[in-house]
Design a protein with these regions (language model features):
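Acidic, surface-exposed loops and disordered segments
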Residues: 1-195
Length: 195
């Protein structure tokens, strides 16, 4: 599609590789689009091969495609505004940090490793022509109960995965957010020391 609202490249201070420059997080998804097994496997494989401290790989995932019981269960755990639009995505993915090993060893870097895995999944998704929207607005206890998770697995985010659709499918307020200019803090605000 060539609609300007569907291509939202960055206005970065330095050139970036296209997959990073073009990545953005839509809320408007095509509710008729699906994700095949091979594509879903490619996304999860990208997450699997992300860097991991001491190769402990303290990340786990629960994924449900639209129409499945798992998708509906995940969707029911979304809070606030997220619940209004995420059901149109092709899949919902719960990202879990394994904060403790089965033997009780604490993994204080688990959320960092999980974030790297989801970032790799996001880049792979964009390469596959898909878009993600990561959400922290979830009922953590609800996710834990719905999937009978042990205490060592902490639900961190839910990610909507799918094919972007025109923002006219959203309500007026959401559509305005969808088409607003993308912004980030400048480098001098996020880099505290640089010599």
């Amino acid at each position: 599609m060539h609609d300007a609202t569907l291509s939202r490249s960055t206005d970065s201070s330095q050139p970036l590789v296209p997959l990073l420059e073009e990545r953005w997080s839509p809320r408007s998804y095509d509710e008729t689009a699906t994700i095949g097994d091979d594509t879903l496997d490619a996304l999860l494989e990208a997450a699997r091969w992300a860097p991991s401290a001491a190769n402990m790989q303290p990340r786990r995932f629960i994924v449900g495609r639209r129409g499945s019981a798992t998708f509906r269960t995940i969707e029911q755990q979304l809070l606030g505004f997220n619940a209004a639009w995420a059901g149109r995505a092709s899949a919902l993915l719960v990202a879990l940090a394994e904060v403790e090993s089965a033997d009780g060893d604490v993994r204080r870097w688990a959320e960092y490793d999980l974030g790297q895995a989801v970032a790799a999944l996001a880049v792979q998704a964009h390469a596959e022509g898909l878009h993600l929207h990561q959400m922290g607005g979830i009922d953590v206890d609800g996710v834990r109960a719905a999937f009978d998770l042990p205490a060592r697995l902490v639900p961190v985010t839910v990610t909507a995965i799918g094919t972007v659709a025109h923002p006219s499918r959203l309500d007026e307020k959401a559509a305005a957010r969808e088409t607003a200019p993308r912004t980030r803090l400048p480098l001098d605000e996020i880099v505290l020391v640089r010599e």
